[in-house]
């Protein structure tokens, strides 16, 4: 599989280059040249496959010959070595629990896969790589854990002051060794802007050999497809119809991976982009006017993004045709008051719920 730069289609690279380089010229994101479909029999009979085999089948065409098959199987096995259960809330709603990983964030999967790929690619390289990443909360901890103490790799994490939770800040700042956390007096969008600025500086790139661990990196973005397949495997045990998939959305890498999996053959009736008060995409879907804004601080801080980087990939998946996009995706914006009200209602009205206490 080769990847082209969405801002310069003549820039074409392989998976290894895309993973190490992070993004292309002029801050362009890389995108796969082809969308290889899942075998129908595979999708219809996921229960016959182990989770590791499902993950391997999901990723093998994107990695191609850059990682040997057995090494890739080992990478995906280590990446998904924790429970990813689909819990039934009521007759109409099930929720995929993605908080059982080492940093309690759904990004443990993407960050875990990427860190292992980079470790493999860089094992014989003399020059140290610097992973530069902006975080709104979850990404930083997952990346820090995934890359912690890996030889030949330094990690620099930019996070917005007073906009991550105390637990998230400890995950960023407490590890030490090759993990460096920098507090930025601004929003996540400011952090992301600094990262993009660094990547566009040729001298900085050459000196530090920069790569990114945000979902702009294909090695972080693409493996998120895996848990959509694992959710479908469990869904098929009790349901015959295709699900409507609702995804909490900030930088839009997660839902973009789900849509990619769908276009490859994963059944989905519709997608819902669930946003907090940062409503750029819901407004776009209503008005056809894409107008990035300065991110607003909310209780769901990991979703505080006013200019979602991955939306350009979603548009590419739909050939930049608004009507095709709107037919498959709806967007909703929920404020803090409604967020708290819904949490309270779920706890009060749902029999099956759990409180996880981390000592």
Where are these predicted regions, by residue range?
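PLP-dependent amino-acid enzyme catalytic core
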Residues: 1-359
């Amino acid at each position: 599989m080769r990847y082209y730069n969405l801002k310069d289609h003549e820039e074409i690279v392989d998976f290894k280059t895309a993973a190490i380089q992070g993004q292309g010229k002029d801050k362009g994101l890389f995108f796969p040249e082809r969308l290889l479909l899942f075998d129908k029999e595979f999708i219809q009979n996921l229960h016959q496959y182990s989770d590791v085999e499902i993950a391997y089948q999901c990723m093998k065409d994107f990695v191609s010959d850059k990682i040997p098959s057995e090494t890739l199987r080992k990478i995906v096995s280590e990446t998904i070595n924790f429970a990813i259960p689909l819990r039934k809330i009521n007759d109409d709603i099930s929720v995929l629990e993605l908080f059982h990983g080492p940093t309690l964030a759904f990004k443990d999967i993407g960050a875990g896969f990427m860190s292992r790929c980079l470790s493999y690619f860089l094992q014989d390289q003399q020059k140290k790589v610097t992973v530069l990443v902006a975080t709104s909360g979850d990404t930083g901890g997952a990346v820090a854990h995934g890359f912690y103490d890996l030889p030949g790799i330094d990690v620099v994490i930019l996070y917005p002051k007073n906009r991550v939770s105390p637990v998230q800040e400890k995950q960023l700042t407490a590890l030490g060794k090759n993990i460096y956390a920098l507090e930025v007096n601004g929003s996540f969008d400011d952090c992301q802007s600094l990262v993009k600025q660094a990547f566009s500086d040729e001298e900085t790139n050459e000196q530090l050999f920069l790569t990114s661990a945000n979902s702009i990196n294909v090695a972080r973005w693409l493996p998120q497809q895996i848990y959509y397949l694992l959710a479908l495997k469990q869904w098929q045990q009790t349901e015959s119809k295709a699900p409507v998939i609702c995804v909490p959305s900030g930088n839009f890498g997660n839902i973009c991976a789900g849509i990619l999996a769908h276009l490859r053959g994963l059944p989905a009736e519709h997608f819902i982009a669930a946003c907090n008060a940062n409503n750029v995409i819901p407004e776009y879907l209503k008005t056809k006017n894409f107008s990035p804004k300065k991110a607003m601080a909310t209780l769901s801080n990991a979703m505080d993004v006013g200019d979602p980087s991955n939306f350009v990939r979603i548009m590419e998946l739909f050939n930049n045709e608004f009507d095709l996009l709107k037919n498959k995706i709806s967007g909703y914006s929920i404020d803090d008051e409604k967020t708290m009200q819904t949490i309270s209602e779920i706890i009060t009205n749902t029999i099956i719920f759990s409180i996880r206490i981390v000592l």
